[in-house]
């Protein structure tokens, strides 16, 4: 029963928001391109990177390019799924932390965060961050 209710709670906001859509996560491809350039010994900042039919600069510090190297070593789909799962997990963890501080008397912060997570995922800033493959949640 609990699993059924949790499933409805998880899917309902997504359906209200328009249902499934696959979007090209352009930002993650910029991160991957910068990391690949670093691996090739190229200057990160003297060129643009062709992603999604446009040219974008790498605007992050060199340390970021080093941290993005694992993304450059795997196919786009693997990088995207890994990045998205990490973002969702960290968003959940942020919800747990906020609940612990905002409502310390609640019995199970992790379970409540799990119930809140689907609603947080369809909030415009979070939905767009994940849709574009941005780094915001991971920071």
Region annotations inferred by a language model:
Residues 1-109, 128:
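TM-lumen/periplasm interface segments of multi-pass membrane proteins
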Residues 66, 81-82, 113-118, 138:
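Hydrophobic alpha-helical transmembrane segments
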Residues 125-139:
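Multi-pass, polyprenyl lipid-linked donor-dependent membrane glycosyltransferases
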């Amino acid at each position: 029963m609990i699993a059924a209710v949790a499933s409805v709670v998880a899917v309902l906001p997504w359906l209200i928001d328009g249902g499934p859509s696959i979007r090209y996560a352009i930002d993650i491809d910029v991160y991957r391109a910068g990391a690949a350039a670093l691996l090739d010994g190229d200057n990160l900042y003297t060129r643009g990177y062709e992603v999604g039919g446009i040219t974008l600069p790498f605007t992050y510090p060199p340390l970021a390019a080093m941290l993005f190297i694992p993304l450059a070593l795997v196919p786009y789909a693997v990088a995207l799924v890994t990045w998205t799962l990490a973002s969702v997990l960290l968003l959940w963890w942020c919800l747990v932390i906020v609940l612990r501080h905002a409502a310390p008397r609640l019995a199970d912060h992790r379970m409540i965060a799990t119930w809140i997570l689907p609603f947080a995922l369809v909030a415009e800033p979070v939905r767009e961050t994940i849709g574009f493959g941005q780094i915001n949640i991971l920071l």
